[in-house]
């Protein structure tokens, strides 16, 4: 694999060159402004293209070395695509309110994540021994914790790089990253301060089409990093007979990007349960929401490899979900897309 390709025309069509009204500008962005049209600042895409490429390279390099990338975008038009892009590239995200101390007080955040796991396990087991009211309260607690921490519950520690949409809105996240020395790649609009951003990508941070394009490129760069990292380790996770086409958002011409629950039919080995792994089992904890206990449950059911999950058809998902009492987790947490990304990366290595 290689870094994803993009063109200045794509950026233009997505509206990446439109800044804010001239009177709302931040003077520190002056060098990135091409001019003014109808009192709107126009961003110099001749600078955006190499800056975005540099950010993509940083993401790929970080993931190739085993690092973690955290997507941060809590504004309405960014929330869904940030989550979808992080999931399909096996990375992490915050798309709800940023909790103070998410990075600088990771120990406390870890405690909340452990509580989420415990509540999840109780409810996954049917909440036996609990009253209807207690189950309802636990369900509400789970929803609240999932909204705040669902995108980072499997991160295992602070990330190695942040990718941020809208530096004004995500100032707290950027300050925490700066305090810990974590590099930040960010989309910086004409009303924002580029200081403290490691990889400044001057571009519109409000248009839905533009945000979808940025997140898609970053996700594909992360997948490239996975491929490079596995190639360096000489890993072979069980490649399909012919390479898979890389998954893209449903339609970059739309302001919203649809969540990909079940992707297109898989062009690899058919789904089957195994009596034993074929060679070394894959590290299924890399899938969102999968811990050691759930890995054991999957192994006991005959699931050891990414290719098995990648090959699941809707009826397979329904059957496994029902038998293991996963409560819709396979679709909700995007396991199939993540598994296909790992299989694709292994095939390209």
Curated annotation (Swiss-Prot):
Family annotation (PROSITE patterns): RIBOSOMAL_S2_1, RIBOSOMAL_S2_2
Keywords linked to the UniProt accession: Ribonucleoprotein, Ribosomal protein
Gene Ontology biological process: translation
GO cellular component: cytosolic small ribosomal subunit
GO MF annotations, alphabetized: structural constituent of ribosome
Source organism superkingdom: Bacteria
Database matches in InterPro entries: Ribosomal_uS2 (IPR001865), Ribosomal_uS2_bac/mit/plastid (IPR005706), Ribosomal_uS2_CS (IPR018130), Ribosomal_uS2_flav_dom_sf (IPR023591)
Record protein name field: Small ribosomal subunit protein uS2
Source species: Methylobacterium nodulans (strain LMG 21967 / CNCM I-2342 / ORS 2060)
């Amino acid at each position: 694999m290689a870094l994803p390709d993009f063109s200045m025309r794509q950026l233009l069509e997505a509206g990446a060159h439109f800044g804010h009204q001239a009177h709302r500008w931040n003077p520190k962005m002056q060098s990135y402004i091409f001019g003014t049209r109808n009192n709107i600042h126009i961003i110099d895409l001749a600078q955006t293209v190499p800056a975005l490429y540099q950010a993509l390279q940083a993401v790929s390099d970080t993931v190739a070395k085993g690092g973690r990338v955290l997507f941060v975008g809590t504004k309405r038009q960014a929330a869904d695509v940030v989550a979808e892009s992080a999931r399909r590239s096996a990375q992490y995200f915050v798309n709800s309110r940023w909790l103070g101390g998410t990075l600088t007080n990771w120990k406390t955040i870890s405690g909340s994540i452990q509580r989420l796991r415990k509540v999840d396990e109780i409810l996954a087991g049917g909440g036996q021994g609990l009253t209807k009211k207690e189950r309802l309260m636990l369900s509400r607690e789970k929803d609240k914790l999932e909204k705040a921490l669902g995108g980072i519950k499997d991160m295992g520690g602070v990330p190695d790089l942040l990718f941020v949409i809208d530096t004004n809105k995500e100032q707290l996240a950027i300050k925490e990253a700066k305090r810990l020395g974590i590099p930040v790649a960010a989309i910086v609009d004409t009303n924002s301060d580029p200081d403290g951003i490691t990889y400044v990508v001057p571009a519109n941070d409000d248009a839905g089409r533009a945000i979808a394009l940025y997140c898609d490129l970053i996700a594909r760069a992360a997948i490239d990093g996975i491929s490079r990292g596995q190639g360096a380790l000489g890993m072979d996770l069980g490649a399909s007979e012919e390479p898979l086409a890389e998954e893209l958002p449903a339609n970059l011409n739309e302001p919203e990007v649809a969540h990909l629950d079940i992707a297109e039919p898989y062009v690899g080995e058919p789904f089957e349960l195994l009596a034993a792994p074929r060679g070394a089992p894959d590290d299924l904890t890399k899938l969102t929401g999968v811990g050691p206990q759930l890995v054991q449950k999957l192994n006991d059911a005959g699931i050891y490899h990414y290719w098995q999950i990648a090959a699941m058809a809707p009826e397979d998902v329904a059957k496994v979900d029902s038998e293991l009492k996963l409560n819709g987790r396979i679709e909700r947490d995007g396991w199939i897309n993540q598994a296909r990304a790992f299989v694709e990366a292994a095939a390209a290595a």
